[in-house]
């Protein structure tokens, strides 16, 4: 793949996402706090300053927002306006509704919303950070490869 994945967040899920995405040959860039940077040895690059998305000077194919902050709506808007093809937010259904309302109120078009994935990931009934990361990365690979997300046994004719 060698597509660039920018993960903005910290903690266990961000750590697992970084590690698993690296195994899948994504070029992983993590934006996190200075105190957290040692947690991401498999990242190609770590950004520790409060860089706005509009100031990022490299191409981003996938963006995962795993911060659970009140700024998730603004950051999602920035990512969509920047034209990032996959903007995924780790969020509850309630939080997703709030973000979607914000995006629509701020002029995000239906076409732009096609690139917004929240809650991000496939429905695996994931319970652990590892399972959540698998769900998210499975969705990204499915979209990149034009997969259906169906069980293989259900598509054998």
Report residues per predicted region.
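Short phosphate-binding/catalytic loops that engage adenosine nucleotides
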Residues: 26, 84, 108
């Amino acid at each position: 793949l060698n597509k660039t994945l920018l993960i903005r967040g910290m903690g266990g899920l961000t750590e697992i996402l970084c590690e698993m995405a690296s195994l899948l040959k994504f070029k992983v860039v993590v934006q996190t706090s200075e105190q957290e940077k040692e947690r991401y040895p498999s990242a190609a690059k770590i950004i520790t300053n409060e860089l706005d998305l509009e100031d990022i000077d490299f191409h981003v194919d996938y963006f995962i927002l795993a911060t659970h902050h009140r700024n998730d709506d603004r950051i999602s808007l920035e990512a969509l306006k920047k034209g990032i093809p996959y903007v995924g937010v780790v969020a509850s259904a309630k939080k997703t509704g709030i973000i979607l309302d914000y995006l629509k109120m701020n002029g995000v078009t239906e076409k732009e919303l096609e690139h917004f994935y929240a809650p991000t990931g496939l429905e695996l009934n994931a319970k652990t950070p590892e399972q959540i990361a698998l769900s998210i990365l499975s969705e990204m690979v499915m979209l990149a490869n034009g997969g259906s997300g169906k069980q293989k046994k259900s598509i054998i004719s």
